[in-house]
Regions:
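Residues immediately within or flanking Cys/His clusters that coordinate Zn2+
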Residues: 2, 6, 39-50, 200, ...
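Non-heme iron-sulfur electron-transfer modules
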Residues: 6-41, 55-85, 390-393
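Residues that scaffold the ATP/ADP-binding catalytic core of kinase and kinase-like folds
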Residues: 8, 51, 247-248
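Active-site-adjacent bridging/hinge elements
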Residues: 20, 25-27, 46-47, 161, ...
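N-terminal low-complexity, Ser/Thr- and acidic-residue-enriched intrinsically disordered segments
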Residues: 49, 54-55, 91
Length: 393
């Protein structure tokens, strides 16, 4: 093959080494037991499909490597070969509801910074001792902000919906509520009518990446009536995590291809910066920025690139006077729960190294990413302070 994908991650070098060392020097010569080495190293970033492989549809070979790997993960999960650790780490609602509480969150956060505890966690649970883990909040975003105030004089754009409903996401709800609170400030500042869902569950991306498709279906069906109501009423549905947006815009409609409600929901899902830029084109976005941001090294997450909407975040940040944005369009290497695991931590840091170097070379005042987890990972790699894009606005 062309091997254009070899530099993207460690799955492809593993695959090509197995092929080159086989008796036939083709895939048919690789021991099928070794297939799992490739499957486990794929974290479903979709970059090979989007940017490298020349054989994707409509080519007659119809190569879709990410979804092929996902099927492998689904087989492994169905056979009961997935680890307890992976099942627990992908249960983001359970983890959040258990740990994002007063006192408990403080104990967990303190423990996660304790070397003795992290050594124990590494040796028993295989969560790498050197991985910086996100803190859990003492309160949830939804619990504090569910009763959002109504807008007295809401705007009426013509190109995008005038009303917004926020899909909170597990990370914003349990780990960094400040991201959601900053976005609410933006909505209020710009007189955008908005609501929070009365209830929601995880989008299902962590379970999808594990191959637990039954759990993905259960989560999707719980979210369906909630999101369908707002989609049918013409709301823009906005998620503050690119992976969650991608799940609803791409993966769920593919999994449930006959469900028209999921297709309608996908049509109403917006990236936050894409939505705000649309308002700006109608001169409905406040540009009353009080501070310049100087130089920003901005990392474009894989799951945002896959959405093919362009560099909306960069465009919007550059509306701020005195702000220059340098984009980094490479995988950061963290990739959900994958980079947390002991066996993949070194690969995670290796994949991220070009991103770390590129971020530093710009001599930035800020290092930023739409993906909060990627942002933390890059900060760990370059040891710089970082702020999320939403905070900047």
């Amino acid at each position: 093959g062309c091997r254009r994908c070899v530099s993207l991650c460690t799955a492809f070098p593993t695959l090509f080494d197995l092929v080159d060392e086989s008796s036939t020097m083709e895939v048919d010569g690789v021991d099928k037991k070794d297939y799992w080495k490739v499957v486990d190293k794929c974290y479903l970033c979709d970059m090979c499909y989007l940017s490298k492989c020349p054989y994707v549809p409509p080519h007659e070979w119809n190569v879709d490597f990410p979804h092929l790997m996902m099927r492998g993960k689904a087989i492994k999960f169905k056979k009961g070969e997935s680890k307890v650790r992976d099942k627990l780490l992908s249960s983001t609602d359970f983890m959040g509801k258990t740990l994002a509480k007063p006192v408990i969150s403080n104990v967990v956060n303190t423990s996660n910074k304790n070397k003795i505890f992290r050594n124990l966690l590494d040796s028993t649970f295989k969560v790498h001792q050197h991985r910086d883990l996100p803190d859990y909040s003492a309160y949830t975003f939804r619990g504090k902000n569910i009763n959002t105030k109504s807008i007295t004089d809401p705007i009426s754009p013509s190109t995008v919906p005038s009303k917004v409903v926020l899909f909170t996401t597990c990370y914003v709800n349990y780990n960094e509520p400040i991201i959601g609170e900053d976005f609410l400030k933006i909505l209020n500042k710009n007189n955008i009518q908005h609501e929070l869902l009365n209830s929601e569950v995880c989008c299902g991306m962590p379970k999808f990446e594990l191959g637990d498709l039954e759990s993905v279906e259960k989560l999707a069906m719980k979210n369906l009536p909630l999101l369908s109501k707002y989609a049918n009423e013409g709301y823009a549905i906005i998620s503050l995590v690119p992976s969650c947006t991608l799940m609803f815009k791409q993966e769920i409609p593919l999994l449930f291809a006959d469900n028209q409600e999921f297709k309608k929901i996908a049509q109403q899902f917006y990236d936050p910066f894409s939505y705000l830029l649309a308002l700006n084109k109608e001169s409905l976005l406040s540009l009353d920025f009080k501070n310049d941001l100087g130089n920003i090294s901005y990392h474009v997450p894989c799951h945002l690139r896959v959405q093919n909407i362009g560099l909306k975040t960069k465009e919007l940040l550059e509306l701020i006077p005195g702000t220059t944005v340098k984009t980094i369009e490479r995988c950061s290497g963290h990739d959900g729960t994958w980079g947390i695991k002991t066996e993949f931590f070194k690969d995670s840091m290796k994949i991220g190294k070009p991103v770390f170097k590129a971020a530093e070379q710009f001599n930035p005042d800020y290092i930023s990413s739409d993906c909060a987890i990627a942002s933390r990972h890059i900060v760990q790699g370059v040891r710089e302070n970082s702020k999320k894009n939403i905070e900047k606005l």
